[in-house]
C-alpha cells in the first residue's frame, strides 16, 4: 500500500492530510500547541484514532502513543553518533535513516515495514510512504 503527504509532514501546529495513492484522504493529522508537542490522528470521517504526545524534560526525545486514553507505548530516540535512530517499545520496531532528508525505513527486525522518502521533481515536496 502506498500513502502520500505533501510538504509539512511534521508541522506540530498545523493540520494536514495523508492520502491514498488514488487521492482520497486516509488520515488527517492535527497539531496542537501544548506543553511539549502533541499530534492527533483522525480517520477520514473526523473520528479520533490516536494521539502522539512528547514527554518533556527528557535528555533525548520521547513520544508516547495513546489510543483513546490508554498509552500503548513509547517512541524514543536512541543515542547514536552517525545517524538518528528511534525505537518503538510497544512493537519492537526501529526507525533509521536521514530524517533531515526525509529518507528512512521502519524495520521489524530484518523485515521492512515501511519506507519514507522525498519524491524529486514535483512542484511541492511530496513524500510517499510505502507500507509493506
Segments and roles (model prediction):
Residues 1-132:
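Intrinsically disordered, low-complexity proline/glycine-rich segments
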Amino acid at each position: 500500500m502506498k500513502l502520500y503527504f505533501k510538504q509539512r509532514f511534521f508541522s506540530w501546529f498545523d493540520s494536514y492530510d495523508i492520502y491514498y495513492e488514488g487521492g482520497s484522504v486516509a488520515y488527517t493529522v492535527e497539531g496542537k500547541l501544548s506543553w511539549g508537542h502533541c499530534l492527533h490522528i483522525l480517520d477520514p470521517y473526523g473520528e479520533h484514532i490516536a494521539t502522539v504526545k512528547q514527554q518533556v524534560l527528557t535528555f533525548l526525545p520521547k513520544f508516547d502513543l495513546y489510543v483513546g486514553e490508554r498509552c500503548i507505548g513509547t517512541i524514543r530516540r536512541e543515542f547514536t553518533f552517525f545517524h538518528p535512530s528511534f525505537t518503538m517499545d510497544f512493537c519492537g520496531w526501529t526507525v533509521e535513516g536521514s530524517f533531515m532528508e526525509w529518507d528512512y525505513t521502519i524495520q521489524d527486525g530484518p523485515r521492512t515495514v515501511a519506507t519514507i522518502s522525498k519524491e524529486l521533481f514535483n512542484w511541492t515536496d511530496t513524500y510517499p510512504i510505502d507500507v509493506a
